Design a protein with these regions (language model features):
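Catalytic, metal-anchored helix/loop core of enzyme active sites in primary metabolism
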Residues: 2-4, 12-15, 31, 36-40, ...
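Residue-level recognition of short, well-ordered coil/turn positions
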Residues: 22-23, 37, 93, 171
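Substrate-binding/catalytic subdomain of NAD(P)-dependent oxidoreductase enzymes
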Residues: 28-125, 130-132
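Oxidoreductase and adenylate-handling cofactor-binding alpha/beta cores
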Residues: 1, 14-18, 22-23, 53-67, ...
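Catalytic cores of large soluble enzymes that bind and process phosphate-bearing ligands
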Residues: 2-6, 20-24, 43-51, 73-80, ...
Length: 192
């Protein structure tokens, strides 16, 4: 079983613009801030911590146990250069910041890192402020979830939607929960 995704619209916007326009990381980050996609202090996004937190939530949901995002190998996009993007593009790849959770024989593996994604991967065409999650399961096969992941309106809409759902169904609301048992994440062995 594997869940791998582009979980941060801000970083995906930055990487998409760098790939499409050949612009530098710094210039693209400034544009993302001007458009309201990146915070004034973008560290949580560009250093991978937002994606790491979301990856920890996904791992907690599938395992039923707690996962600390600090336990997940995390590398952001701060060091991805326009030269890296040009090489990836020339080879037919796109660089995406991925959060990934894999289970193998009751062991859990997780990482967050910029990775080269090939054209045949369903995550390849996920561009701009969009997020995408690829889920691979034994019975399910491969499926994708896709939607906007950055900007004031998508964020506000998601928060308001959650509040309304909780209020409407408060009498029978059952949140997703997990035990207090902590997950042990296996080292990736240099894969990330």
């Amino acid at each position: 079983t594997e869940i791998t995704g582009i979980l941060n619209g801000t970083t995906n916007f930055i990487l998409t613009k760098m790939r499409e326009e050949g612009s530098s990381f710094e210039d693209t980050l400034k544009e993302a801030q001007r458009l309201g996609y990146a915070e004034r202090d973008p560290s949580a996004d560009i250093d991978g911590f937002d994606t790491s937190r979301k990856t920890a939530i996904l791992l907690s949901m599938i395992s039923g146990n707690r996962c600390r995002h600090e336990d997940i190998y995390t590398e952001g996009i701060r060091n991805v250069s326009d030269i890296d993007m040009a090489y990836a593009k020339a080879l037919g790849y796109s660089i995406k910041l991925l959060g990934s959770v894999q289970t193998v024989e009751d062991k859990y593996f997780a990482y967050v890192a910029p990775m080269m994604v090939e054209e045949q991967d369903p995550l390849y065409p996920v561009n701009g402020v969009y997020n995408g999650i690829r889920i691979v399961g034994n019975c399910l096969g491969t499926t994708m979830l896709y939607g906007m992941g950055a900007g004031k309106l998508p964020t506000a809409s998601a928060v308001v939607s959650d509040i309304i759902a909780a209020v409407r169904h408060k009498s029978n609301f059952q949140g997703i929960g997990w035990s207090d048992k902590m997950i042990e994440i296996e080292p990736m062995g240099g894969n990330a």
